[in-house]
Structures are given as C-alpha cells and as structure tokens.
Design a protein with these regions (language model features):
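Short, low-complexity disordered leader/linker segments with a strong preference
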Residues: 8-12
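Divalent metal-binding segments
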Residues: 14-34, 38, 42-266
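Bacterial N-terminal signal peptides
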Residues: 1-7
C-alpha cells in the first residue's frame, strides 16, 4: 500500500518509473476532481484534485497544481466525483497485517468458518472435530518432519489441549498450535526437540515467564510466549511464510476495500 504522503515524498527524486516514462510514451493520466479529497498528509490534509495513472497516484492538490505537476504528460479530466468526498479507502488502524498473514496462511482449524481466497476453512465445533481435523492436516503432509503450524484453537470450544494429544497426532513431525488469540502456543515433543525447548532452557527463565508457562504440556502464554518465541520464531515466521502471508494480506485487504493497514507498536 502506498499512501499519498509517501508518493509526495517519492516525487521529489527521479525514480525507475520516471526513467521508464522517459523511454516510453506515457499513458494518459486521469485527473479526478471532487468536493474534497482526504489525503492523510498533515501538510496538505485536503485537496480538490488527484491525478492517477494506472494504480499510481501522481499528484494531489488544486486542479491547477495537479495540471502543473503533470507538465506535458497527457491527461483527461473526470468529474465523476465532483460533488463527493474521496477518502483513502477503509483505514484499518489495528488489524495486524503481519499476524494476519502468518495465521491465515497456516492450517486454519478455528471456531468459525473462514472464507478465504484459497478456500473455506470450516469450523471445528468441539474437541473431537478439532483433533480429527488436526489428524487430517498431519496426514496431508508428505514429509514426516515438516512443520505443521495451525491456528484457531480455543479451549472453550475444543477442550484442554495437552502435549500428549499432539504427540498422538505425530511423534516425528513438529506441531505448533497457535491459539486463536495469538497469545498462546502449544508444542508437541518433536517441536520441543527440533527447536531446543528443553528443561534446562525453561529453568533458566525468569520467574514471570515460567509462571505463564506449563512446561509439562509445552503450553506458553503471554510472557511465556515471548520467552519461547526466539526458539520457534524462525519456523513460524520464515522468509517464505512472511512473503506468502504479506501477499495474501495485500490481495485480501484490497479485495475488501482496505487500502491502509497498521501493525500497532507496543
């Protein structure tokens, strides 16, 4: 997502786009005029015109300013929105794009249906349905040592989850169950072994994360989760998973009208 302020800053220096424009005849730009255009730029919070070429915003400002910016580039005027207000799509201030990307591209076994571009992940309504779905997900993976990362479990619907439950699914494949809240994880023995989650490591932790962990069942929440993340983080957020996740988020957000998303700081 490219916001108007960033485009304004980028316009101050030559770019590859500018070089391409110099080598090939530029496509016709469109100048949209409106009653008001909200820009999200503190230096210019509103405008009356915006120039667009393809999917790129070229300039905002008054009609005269936009025309001046385009120079000799061909353009046409479009007054479709002359009596309307243009805003930058749906602004989602607290939607965790990175978290969404990592969870939505994992094996989704949740308490409700998730209708996604790659298909619909049906709800698991109780413990038996959840464990059966987890077994099926394990069986679909041909490599017995490949990670099974799943998101959506919730104890209020699926019952308490023990390490023995996950070990019964696979004794060779690392399994990481990411709680629906994203604040908790559960591991099986193979995951502990692969990622170095040992008794010695656990005993070396400060008191607070140890109190928010159940080592016997490989269950870590809140500060316990932050303690174990350095061990499992490269598996959950590998470069391949991050890339696939962010591509999913981009397409999913745009398809639903979200043009600006934010990962809140903490």
């Amino acid at each position: 997502v490219v916001t108007l302020p960033l485009m304004a800053a980028a316009a101050q220096e030559p770019s590859l786009q500018d070089l391409g424009d110099a080598l090939t005849p530029p496509a016709t730009a469109v100048i949209y005029t409106a009653k008001e255009i909200v820009t999200l730029d503190p230096a210019q919070p509103t405008a009356q015109a915006v120039a667009v070429q393809g999917s790129r915003i070229l300039a905002t400002g008054s009609l005269e300013q936009v025309r001046t910016h385009l120079g000799r580039r061909p353009y046409r005027l479009d007054a479709t929105f002359a009596d309307q207000v243009i805003v930058p799509g749906l602004i989602a201030q607290h939607d965790h794009p990175l978290l969404a990307g990592l969870t939505m591209t994992s094996e989704i076994i949740a308490i409700e249906d998730w209708v996604l571009p790659q298909g619909t992940a049906r709800a698991a309504h109780n413990r038996s349905e959840y464990l059966q779905r987890l077994k099926e997900a394990n069986d679909r993976l041909k490599d017995p040592h490949a990670l099974l990362l799943t998101w959506g479990y919730h104890q209020y619907f699926h019952g308490q989850l023990k390490k023995a439950d996950l070990d019964a699914i696979s004794s060779t494949r690392p399994i990481i169950v990411w709680h629906r809240s994203a604040h908790e994880v559960y591991l099986n023995t193979a995951a502990e072994r692969k990622y170095g989650v040992s008794r010695g490591w656990f005993d070396s932790l400060p008191e607070s994360p140890r109190k928010q962990s159940d080592f016997a069942n490989a269950h870590y929440w809140e500060q316990g989760l932050f303690a174990v993340l350095p061990k499992i983080g490269t598996a959950i957020a590998s470069p391949e998973r991050i890339q696939a996740g962010l591509q999913f988020v981009r397409d999913y957000y745009h398809a639903n009208g979200v043009t600006l998303g934010a990962e809140p700081g903490g």
